[in-house]
């Protein structure tokens, strides 16, 4: 059974696409495919855990939310939590583990926001802090200063996980954010946060509140209609190295952008010249779905060959075991377990440890 949160969020998505289609006819194909996209993610035959995830979201308590801060590193939902509500909420959110992208805070005052370092989820009076595996706020801090102004723009976030960065894009003033990711778990994690955010991200008009601005479609990029050209900005962060055909991925991203639109590409790289590309023999940092790790120079060449212009690298950062780590909300192995215990500059397989670059380009 679906609760009002999921039903309403999906209705808002439909109406947003309907309004968009009246301006951009290519969006009609999205509307045609939408019922299949949304039904498939709830099909127990495809996703055995889908009914349990839906039930967890459905049982989340309705809180009186006083404020929502989409611009803070810890995405904060200010609300009063009774002890019983806190216990119920914590238990239900933990049924949606592992939480990989965040962090999020539910309860408490924004003025007294917790940090991940000061969390105490054992305190029955404290807000709930979802300390995710990734410090996704750190990535946003690296990326955000280099972005074009998102205010009023249509944004696509490819491989957006549970939606943390999508919420931050909305907080930066984007007119519409559509997050896509084929994970059933991530979809329901997003819906759990949407339950508490409510209409806080909606357009506001003199006559009242309008459409939600942040939406989620549980599909991969290749499921979208090609050459939609609907978005002013497209993000692909942490996706390219999982693609068997990186050039196909770049062309698919390009097809979603309007002419002159901005691509934000963040991916694993290695050091080297324009001819340097690592193709892991088997696993990379214990991941068996990593195919290509280019140098920054090679990646710039790929983007230019794919037809992008004004390509620039704005950030290169080593992924630390402080940025990606095991937590109360993600209790499985994490980065520290994937590095050589005697040399943290290498993975267990002997490859260079994760190094991430962010590039920005224009269509």
UniProtKB/Swiss-Prot annotation:
Listed Pfam families: Methyltransf_9 (PF08003)
InterPro entries: CmoB, Mo5U34_MeTrfas-like, SAM-dependent_MTases_sf
Keywords for the protein's UniProt record, in alphabetical order: Transferase, tRNA processing
Gene3D superfamilies named in the record: Vaccinia Virus protein VP39
Entry annotated with the keyword tRNA processing: yes
Superkingdom to which the source organism belongs: Bacteria
Catalytic activity: carboxy-S-adenosyl-L-methionine + 5-hydroxyuridine(34) in tRNA = 5-carboxymethoxyuridine(34) in tRNA + S-adenosyl-L-homocysteine + H(+)
Entry binding sites for carboxy-S-adenosyl-L-methionine: 101, 134, 139, 159, 181-183, 221-222, 237, 241, 356
Keyword Heme included in the entry's annotation: no
Molecular function GO terms recorded: methyltransferase activity; transferase activity, transferring alkyl or aryl (other than methyl) groups
Entry's EC annotation: 2.5.1.-
GO aspect biological process, one term: tRNA wobble uridine modification
SUPFAM superfamilies listed in its UniProt record: S-adenosyl-L-methionine-dependent methyltransferases (SSF53335)
Enzyme class: transferase
Subunit: Homotetramer.
Family membership noted in the UniProt record: Belongs to the class I-like SAM-binding methyltransferase superfamily. CmoB family.
PANTHER family hit by this protein: METHYLTRANSFERASE, TRNA U34 CARBOXYMETHYLTRANSFERASE
Function: Catalyzes carboxymethyl transfer from carboxy-S-adenosyl-L-methionine (Cx-SAM) to 5-hydroxyuridine (ho5U) to form 5-carboxymethoxyuridine (cmo5U) at position 34 in tRNAs.
UniProt-recorded name of the protein: tRNA U34 carboxymethyltransferase
Source organism: Psychrobacter cryohalolentis (strain ATCC BAA-1226 / DSM 17306 / VKM B-2378 / K5)
């Amino acid at each position: 059974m679906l609760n009002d949160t999921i039903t309403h969020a999906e209705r808002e998505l439909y109406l947003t696409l309907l309004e968009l289609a009246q301006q951009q006819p290519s969006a009609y194909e999205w509307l045609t495919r939408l019922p299949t996209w949304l039904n498939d993610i709830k099909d127990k035959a495809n996703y055995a855990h889908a009914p349990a995830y839906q039930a967890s979201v459905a049982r989340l308590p309705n809180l009186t939310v006083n404020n929502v801060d989409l611009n803070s590193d810890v995405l904060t939902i200010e609300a009063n939590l009774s002890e019983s509500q806190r216990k119920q909420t914590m238990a239900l959110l933990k049924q949606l583990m592992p939480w990989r992208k965040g962090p999020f805070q539910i309860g408490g005052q924004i003025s007294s926001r917790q940090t991940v370092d000061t969390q105490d989820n054992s305190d029955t009076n404290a807000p709930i802090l979802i300390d995710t595996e990734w410090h996704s706020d750190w990535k946003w801090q690296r990326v955000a200063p280099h972005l074009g102004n998102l205010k009023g723009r249509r944004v696509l976030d490819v491989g957006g996980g549970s939606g943390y960065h999508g919420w931050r894009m909305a907080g930066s003033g984007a007119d519409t954010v559509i997050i896509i990711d084929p994970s059933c778990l991530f979809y329901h994690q997003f819906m759990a946060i949407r339950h508490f955010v409510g209409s806080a991200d909606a357009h506001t008009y003199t006559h009242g509140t309008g459409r939600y601005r942040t939406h989620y479609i549980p599909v991969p990029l290749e499921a979208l209609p090609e050459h939609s050209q609907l978005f002013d900005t497209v993000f692909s962060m942490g996706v390219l190295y999982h693609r068997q055909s990186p050039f196909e991925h770049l062309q698919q991203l390009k097809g979603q952008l309007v002419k002159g639109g901005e691509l934000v590409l963040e991916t694993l790289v290695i050091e080297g010249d324009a001819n340097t590309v690592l193709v892991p023999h088997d696993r990379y940092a214990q991941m068996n779905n990593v195919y290509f790790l280019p140098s920054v120079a090679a990646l710039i060449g790929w983007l230019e060959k794919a037809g992008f212009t004004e390509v620039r690298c704005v950030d290169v950062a080593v992924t630390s075991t402080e940025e990606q780590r095991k937590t109360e909300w993600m209790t499985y192995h994490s980065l520290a377990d994937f590095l050589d215990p005697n040399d943290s500059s290498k993975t267990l397989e002997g490859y260079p440890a994760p190094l991430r670059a962010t590039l920005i380009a224009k269509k």
